[in-house]
Amino acid sequence: MAKRKVPPEFVVERDDYKCIRCLACVRVCSYGANFYDENANRVYTENTKCVGCHFCEAICPTEAITVRKNDFDIRPLAHWTPEHLIGIMKQAETGGVLLTSMGNDRPYFSYFDRIVLNASQVTNPSIDPLREPMEIRTYIGRKEEKLEIEEDEDGTVKLKTEIAPQLKLEVPVMFTAMSYGSISLNAILSLARAARTVGTFFNTGEGGLPKELREFKDNMIVQVASGRFGVSADYLNAGSAVEIKIGQGAKPGIGGHLPGEKVTEPISETRMIPVGTDALSPAPHHDIYSIEDLRQLIYAIKEATRYEKPVGVKIAAVHNVAPIAAGAVRAGADYIVIDGIRGGTGAAPKITRDHVGIPIEFAVAVVDQRLREEGIRHMASIVVAGGIRNSADVIKAIALGADAVYIGTAALISLGCHLCQTCYLGKCNWGIATQDPKLTKRLNPEIGARRAANLLRAWAHEIKEILGGMGINAIESLRGNREVLRGVGLHEYELKLLGIKPAGEAW
């Protein structure tokens, strides 16, 4: 039987009259899609190698290149889409699991897009953030149920209650966990510098700690995952908080996977594994099989850090996310990270990324409600991740019950990512998801930091504008305030789970 050719996903069109044969597109394509024919004096493209990163299109000096989606026409079949056919063709040829990157791109509709916000008029005047103070600073960590104060003989009032360690965020947005290995050092440095500039935090991910990041300890969260790469007492004390990764929104129930192609000498040194070998994190932590085991690890980390840093637990948004989160809080977690089905990744089985988990909107709503019902909401902050696209999503997530959000894909887009979903190949032309020195130098961390910081500043301005329009002058007054939300086109049971009313219904 002849080998079936999988149709190319993208087609590169080149205007031969505009092309000056500078061969820039040939030199820069790390996938080898473009090539030059000396005899014909023309540049051609092997479309099957194109991943749709648009880098050649961006650097073409005469704008001669257009990269477009290939229209793979088949007999119209509602059940058998081109995606299904191409997937079967690939697996029939290779016998392997289909890998992919970034977040879930299935056409599940976003519940954030079905939720609208309130605005104040007449009886509850709005606030102008340009003329009146607006507080969007928030703190991540365990809060006390009540505060006690005492007065000295000289009349000085002091706080008697001992406050647990907190992370101070000047804007309620942090950069999510992306490890050294999955993305380049220049990409991490961009986010680290942006976090320091804006006054928020970035997360190292599970790949250990390169020495170049140690100067950012005041804005850094270190992560402990099942692979325990680079974990030591020194590592745990190198940041401002420690996060235990139990699950990830892009691949709940399975471990991490860094392909050997991306394990270069620096990655090998940081992760403490041989060069060129796959870095595999097991599905479970092999010392955590119960809430009691999780509690033991949480307090072991607290002991190692002298109880000076918040310890968080990251879980994927799954069907029983509420009791899992409640158990983690009772086990001693100072904050809970919930990663939704739209969460991104550097590498994951496509079948898992696309079909496992639940939307973050439902997850944060039910977790916040569960913690309130159990009377332990003050014991931990909630951070949500997985598909946060803009400042409106941030506001809606906080109103549903979050204290702050993580962004990953949005941050990478600010650095130049075009969502070609091939991070696992390690050939990112934009210098982000690669360890090839020829490619990583394409990303200038100073420029990247400025762009990422600009993104957060822009969102901060928009958050203040929306809060002012609601008549709210502090982000704390928004947290869990579902009265400012209304659902559009949602079923009754969906509204009930989200804890919001339908649009048109008053207070």
Swiss-Prot record:
A single GO BP: glutamate biosynthetic process
Keyword terms, alphabetized: 4Fe-4S, Amino-acid biosynthesis, Flavoprotein, FMN, Glutamate biosynthesis, Iron, Iron-sulfur, Metal-binding, NADP, Oxidoreductase, Repeat
The protein's Enzyme Commission number: 1.4.1.13
Taxonomic source organism: Thermotoga maritima (strain ATCC 43589 / DSM 3109 / JCM 10099 / NBRC 100826 / MSB8)
Annotated ranges, domain 4Fe-4S ferredoxin-type: 10-39, 41-70
Catalytic reactions on record: 2 L-glutamate + NADP(+) = L-glutamine + 2-oxoglutarate + NADPH + H(+)
Residues annotated to bind [4Fe-4S] cluster 2: C29, C50, C53, C56
Keyword Secreted: no
Protein name as catalogued: Archaeal-type glutamate synthase [NADPH]
A matching Pfam family: Glu_synthase
Gene that specifies this protein: gltB
Molecular function terms from GO: 4 iron, 4 sulfur cluster binding; glutamate synthase (NADPH) activity; metal ion binding
Cofactor annotation: FMN
Enzyme class: oxidoreductase
Keyword Cytoplasm: no
Lineage per the UniProt record: Bacteria, Thermotogati, Thermotogota, Thermotogae, Thermotogales
